[in-house]
């Protein structure tokens, strides 16, 4: 039996559309067990409620990621039980799909005898996810700058330390990335491009130097947040409430609808204010206070292969 623990991520961070991602101390866990039977069993446990959910295998993203690798090596998997312990809300802009893809690929790779190195698995994950800014920080941890040149992936990781607190305000409704991409403009003005690339460089410097006081300017954006936030009632008021109560930076997390804010101290006051602001628009939400993750994917336990040999 082995367990893969993978952190939540906040992609499109501030001005860094499809290029900047941040790893958070909120985790999904995937535990693989060998069965004596030939069955494949997949169960999902919601950490908040303790509820156990069983989805049809074909609808499970981690299963599809596993099968992508098994089919590549012409292996028919049998005798596997997978328990997913889910703490990351689905379709809220926190990288839940990236954890499933990485969990499936790394789990399958272990059961195949580890034919692929981490970097090879990462390239496959980016291909399946279609963009790198969730999967790379989920695997590597930290603050990550990602560049795609054709199918080639380049990235740099910054360790932002553990001082900064993260407050996630998570509305009850879901937004899918595919739908949210449709509201983005096909073209932008030159001045908006300059606005964003200057702040992308500045935000990277802020995380490198741990200059949290400058995050408010560095997190500004004209590429995606103004368009996507139009689908999130109360977004502007939620952002204002966070700043009014001590946040040093606020942005849309991923494609939304989660709003991520940063603070140098405990963030209860910020979280409560954000929830209250959403409430003014009859939207139920909750907040989670957490920290920054610098480790990324972690594997624990006793590996086994489908050939029957355990290591």
Swiss-Prot record:
Q: Name one GO molecular function term.
A: homoserine kinase activity
What reaction does this catalyse?
A: L-homoserine + ATP = O-phospho-L-homoserine + ADP + H(+)
Q: Where in the cell is it found?
A: Cytoplasm
Could you say which EC number(s) this protein's record lists?
2.7.1.39
- Provide the alphabetized UniProt keywords: Amino-acid biosynthesis, ATP-binding, Cytoplasm, Kinase, Nucleotide-binding, Threonine biosynthesis, Transferase
Instruction: Kindly tell me the pathway this chain contributes to.
Output: Amino-acid biosynthesis; L-threonine biosynthesis; L-threonine from L-aspartate: step 4/5
Classification via InterPro entries: GHMP_kinase_C_dom (IPR013750), GHMP_kinase_C_sf (IPR036554), GHMP_kinase_N_dom (IPR006204), GHMP_knse_ATP-bd_CS (IPR006203), Homoserine_kinase (IPR000870), Ribosomal_Su5_D2-typ_SF (IPR020568), Ribsml_uS5_D2-typ_fold_subgr (IPR014721)
Which residues of this UniProt protein bind ATP? Answer: 89-99
Q: Which GO terms describe its biological process?
A: threonine biosynthetic process
Keyword Kinase belongs to the record: yes
One GO cellular component term: cytoplasm
- The EC class name is transferase
Protein family according to the UniProt entry: Belongs to the GHMP kinase family. Homoserine kinase subfamily.
Q: Which PANTHER family match?
A: HOMOSERINE KINASE, HOMOSERINE/4-DIPHOSPHOCYTIDYL-2-C-METHYL-D-ERYTHRITOL KINASE
Tell me the function of this protein: Catalyzes the ATP-dependent phosphorylation of L-homoserine to L-homoserine phosphate.
The protein, known as: Homoserine kinase
């Amino acid at each position: 039996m082995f367990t893969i623990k993978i952190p939540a991520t906040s992609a499109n961070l501030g001005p860094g559309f499809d290029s900047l991602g941040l790893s958070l101390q909120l985790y999904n866990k995937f535990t693989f067990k060998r069965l004596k039977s030939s069955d494949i069993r997949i169960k999902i446990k919601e950490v908040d409620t303790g509820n156990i959910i069983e989805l049809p295998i074909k609808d499970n993203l981690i299963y599809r990621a596993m099968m992508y690798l098994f089919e590549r090596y012409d292996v028919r998997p049998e005798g596997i039980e997978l328990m997913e312990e889910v703490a990351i809300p689905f379709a809220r802009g926190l990288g839940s799909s990236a954890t499933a893809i990485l969990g499936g690929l790394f789990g399958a790779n272990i059961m195949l005898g580890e034919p692929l190195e981490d970097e090879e698995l990462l390239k496959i994950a980016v291909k399946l996810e279609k963009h790198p800014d969730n999967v790379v920080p989920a695997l590597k941890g930290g603050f990550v700058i990602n560049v795609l040149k054709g199918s080639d992936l380049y990235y740099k990781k910054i360790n932002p330390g553990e001082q900064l607190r993260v407050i996630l305000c998570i509305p009850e409704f879901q937004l899918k990335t595919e739908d949210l991409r449709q509201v983005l403009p096909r073209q932008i003005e030159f001045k908006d491009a300059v606005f964003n690339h200057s702040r992308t460089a500045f935000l990277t410097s802020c995380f490198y130097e741990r200059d949290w006081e400058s995050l408010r300017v560095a997190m500004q954006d004209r590429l995606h947040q103004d368009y996507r936030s139009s689908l999130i009632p109360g977004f502007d008021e939620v952002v204002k409430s966070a700043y009014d109560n001590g946040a040093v930076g606020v942005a849309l997390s991923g494609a939304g609808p989660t709003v991520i804010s940063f603070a140098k101290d405990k963030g209860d006051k910020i979280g409560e204010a954000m929830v209250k602001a959403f409430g003014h628009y009859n939207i139920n939400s909750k907040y989670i206070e957490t920290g920054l993750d610098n480790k990324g994917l972690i594997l624990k336990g006793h590996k086994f292969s489908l050939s029957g040999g355990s290591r």
